[in-house]
């Protein structure tokens, strides 16, 4: 019996691996069929996450509209996508210059997209601008710039494209947000405020457009790290507050977020949080034990201000 168990273990592991492989392949093919021939608009397509979303959706056969502030960056992304794609299974992406912080140009860009394809099936609001610093040292001009890029830009583009989706009674709007839409982190007042605002808008919009079969989805990771980012090493392990902040800052890779965006589109999920247990616990504590949460965060700020810089 012991020998039989030893022999069965490798076979069991092999069988599980085979089933996982089949599931992943089936999921990949299913994802492709969900976006094939669909007109997909991706904002800030030249960012790390934007590039990965473009890669995933282009491979799935979507008719991409890639928006970005830098034309050279868009052309570089275009060259990368077309160099590895099968022309018989993919469509040539359309490139559009778009700076969401410049609200005046958003309507013209949306009109250009609709004139080209006649519709938009999926809108991925990915653009985001960050700023970090004490609230009293952040100028109102910078506060407004953050709100334009993170709030007014996405909702303006959404409002212009939404009537087309409503009239066709189909479409999906995906907001790539941040877990800071659920609770604020010190020294990120403008960024957190913009994320709270845009989450509130799309939460309300979701209920408004459900009767038209338009899906509104939000994907909120803790932090989208760069390809070269690595966790910062500090002697904070003994502090609960700083342990929380360190865990929160690890974030997720753009590839992971792009794959989750694709799954969200395929399954028409309404809300997704991409976070390890510590940030999820923070959301829970903030909701049910707010006074304790505020005390812990304030304690963390005091400790951070009292820790001398290294080097």
From Swiss-Prot:
| CDD domains the record matches | 11beta-HSD1_like_SDR_c
Localisation: Sarcoplasmic reticulum membrane
Q: Which UniProt keywords apply?
A: Membrane, NAD, NADP, Oxidoreductase, Sarcoplasmic reticulum, Signal
InterPro entries from the entry?
Answer: NAD(P)-bd_dom_sf, Sc_DH/Rdtase_CS, SDR_fam, SDR_family_member_7C
UniProt-listed Gene3D superfamilies: NAD(P)-binding Rossmann-like Domain (3.40.50.720)
- Record's domain comment? The N-terminus region encompasses a short hydrophobic sequence bound to the sarcoplasmic reticulum membrane, whereas the C-terminus catalytic domain faces the myoplasm.
The protein depicted here goes by the name: Dehydrogenase/reductase SDR family member 7C
């Amino acid at each position: 019996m012991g020998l039989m168990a030893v022999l069965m273990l490798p076979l069991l592991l092999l069988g599980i691996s085979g089933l996982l492989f089949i599931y992943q392949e089936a999921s990949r093919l299913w994802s492709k069929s969900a976006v094939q021939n669909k007109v997909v608009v991706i904002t800030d397509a030249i960012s790390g996450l934007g590039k990965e979303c473009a890669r995933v959706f282009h491979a799935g056969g979507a008719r991409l509209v890639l928006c970005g502030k830098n034309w050279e960056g868009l052309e570089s992304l275009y060259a990368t996508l077309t160099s590895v794609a099968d022309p018989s299974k993919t469509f040539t992406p359309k490139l559009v210059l778009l700076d969401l912080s410049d609200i005046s140009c958003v309507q013209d860009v949306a009109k250009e997209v609709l004139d080209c394809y006649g519709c938009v099936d999926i809108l991925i609001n990915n653009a985001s601008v960050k700023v970090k610093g004490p609230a009293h040292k952040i100028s109102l001009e910078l506060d407004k710039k953050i709100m334009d890029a993170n709030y007014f830009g996405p909702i303006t583009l959404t409002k212009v494209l939404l009537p087309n989706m409503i009239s066709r009674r189909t479409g999906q709007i995906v907001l790539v947000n941040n877990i800071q839409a659920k609770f604020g982190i010190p020294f990120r007042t403008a960024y957190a405020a913009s994320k709270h605002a845009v989450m509130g808008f799309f939460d309300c919009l979701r209920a408004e457009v459900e009767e038209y079969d338009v899906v509104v989805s939000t994907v909120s990771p803790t932090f989208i790290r760069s390809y070269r980012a690595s966790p910062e090493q500090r002697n904070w392990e003994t502090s609960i507050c700083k342990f929380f902040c360190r865990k929160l800052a690890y974030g997720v890779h753009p590839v992971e977020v792009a794959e989750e965006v694709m799954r969200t589109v395929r399954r028409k999920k309404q809300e997704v949080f991409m976070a390890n247990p510590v940030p999820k616990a923070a959301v829970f504590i903030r909701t049910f034990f707010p006074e304790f949460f505020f005390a812990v965060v304030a304690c963390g700020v005091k400790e951070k201000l009292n820790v001398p810089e290294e080097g």
